[in-house]
Amino acid sequence: MDEKEKQLTHFVSSYWDYFLELENEFASTQKYVAFDVCNKNTYSIEYLKLFQAVCSEIDVLGKEILHHFEPEFKVGGFENIKHWGYGVSKYMRRSILTPVTFVEKIELTPWKKFGYESVLDKNGYKRYRLEDGCEKPKWWSDYNHVKHARTTCGEDGKVNYQLANFSNLTQAFAALFVLEQHYMGVLMQEADTYYAARESRLFVIEYVDPDSDDKKEMSLAGAV
């Protein structure tokens, strides 16, 4: 097994398998709350736990993706969405805008209007900022409210832990799914191989074949 294949198998065991475990926990909550947009504001302790776990994993994977494309980037503990958001925007912009279908009926685009750019400040240091017309995902901002001040009331008078709801959780899961699938596709392409990893139970990526008007479904990026 060469180095590229090792990177692929490491990703599957360290990241993709963990996603599937989180997804299994989410799937088990359907016994109590139907997966339906009518329940978008439903919140619970289980959703709170999963929301924080999924968003934390997005942060971890985002840094991994940036380090993969720019090995000089080192994770030191102070990096945030501005840093890895720049890497994701630069190297995977088209991929992350792909719509995701949840339980075959709910279409999500969690990275819509997402984009960061790098600029040099007056001292010549690289800084990161949102590109014109782009914005930080609302579900990510809500995650930070939950993470840092979950018992504090927001401007609407509601306690922040209520932001750990069905809508935000599905958006976060879809966001992680998109990153995982397309990064896995990158690793497969670099290794010039296909890895038959286990498929998601709840999420499917839809893409448009440039040579066809038909939409196709994809559960593994490497299958494109």
Identify the meaning behind each predicted range.
Residues 23, 30, 44-69, 170-177:
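Short, hydrophobic, well-ordered secondary-structure elements
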Residues 162-205:
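Amphipathic, Lys/Arg-enriched alpha-helical patches that create a basic surface
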